[in-house]
């Protein structure tokens, strides 16, 4: 997020996709990585069009609106064309804003407004507009957290933590170690059985060289892993599991590198 001022979700997602892509290159070659990305992108595009049609059939339906905004985000984060990414994000932003006129206290609308702001910032970076969007993202995630901190497995809380973790610190941006710790620990407490929350916290702790804290979080991740594999299943979770497995392996390797066991 240093030069392009990605949103929390965008910066995190781009990092994860890069790691997963590298893993696929190692174990299966470039063709495997490309094929996998094409599959995920095709699925996201199909869902985008389905959700768009559903939304257009009843634009005053609240669920239709935020689910379309979610589909806009999911599609935007996978496409490689910046113009296409920005266009999809703007559609998501418009759907959220339209919903918020009617329901200003809609947590999903504030949440996906922040997510799509992140995609728009990524598409337009580097620019002053992208830089300014960071504060919009922060505000919308905070509002979503105030309205429903449990939404999307503590998504608003987790993504605030990731925003503060990925962003440069003051005076350049909103980055803050203290706020990162506060929000990521809170997300891990609110939805402890969701792998993403434990992974985000562990990755931050490893960056800060916090041995005891990272060890505790990685043990918690190991404890919830078997149940998570049965709770988060199906096509919709394939991409997440591909990323989670690679990130868990990387976190374990980083822990061993930073804190080698005594001979």
Identify what each model region corresponds to.
Residues 1-2:
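Methionine residue identity
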Residues 33-50, 68-105, 111-143, 147, ...:
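Short coil/linker segments at helix-helix boundaries
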Residues 143, 204-208, 255-258:
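Extended, low-polarity transmembrane helix blocks
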Residues 261-263:
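Short, solvent-exposed mixed-charge patches
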């Amino acid at each position: 997020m240093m030069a392009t001022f990605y949103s929390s979700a965008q910066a995190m997602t781009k990092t994860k996709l890069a790691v997963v892509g590298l893993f696929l290159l190692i174990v299966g070659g470039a063709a495997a990585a490309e094929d996998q990305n094409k599959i995920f992108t095709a699925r996201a595009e199909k869902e985008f069009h389905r959700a768009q049609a559903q939304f257009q059939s009843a634009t005053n339906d609240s669920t239709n609106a935020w689910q379309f905004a979610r589909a806009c985000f999911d599609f935007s984060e996978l496409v490689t064309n910046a113009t296409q990414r920005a266009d999809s994000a703007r559609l998501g932003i418009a759907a959220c804003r339209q919903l918020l006129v009617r329901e200003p206290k809609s947590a999903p609308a504030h949440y996906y407004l922040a997510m799509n702001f992140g995609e728009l910032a990524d598409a337009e970076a580097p620019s002053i507009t992208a830089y300014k969007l960071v504060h919009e993202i922060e505000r919308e995630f905070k509002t979503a957290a105030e309205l429903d901190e449990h939404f999307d497995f503590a998504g608003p809380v987790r993504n605030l933590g990731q925003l503060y973790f990925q962003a440069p610190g003051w005076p350049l941006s909103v980055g803050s170690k203290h706020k990162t710790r506060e929000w990521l620990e809170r997300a891990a407490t609110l939805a402890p059985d969701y792998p993403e929350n434990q992974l985000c916290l562990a990755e931050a702790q490893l960056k800060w060289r916090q041995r005891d804290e990272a060890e505790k979080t990685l043990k918690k991740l190991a404890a919830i892993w078997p149940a998570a594999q049965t709770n988060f299943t199906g096509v919709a979770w394939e991409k997440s599991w591909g990323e989670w497995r690679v990130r868990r392996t990387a976190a374990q390797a980083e822990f061993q590198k930073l804190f080698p066991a005594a001979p």
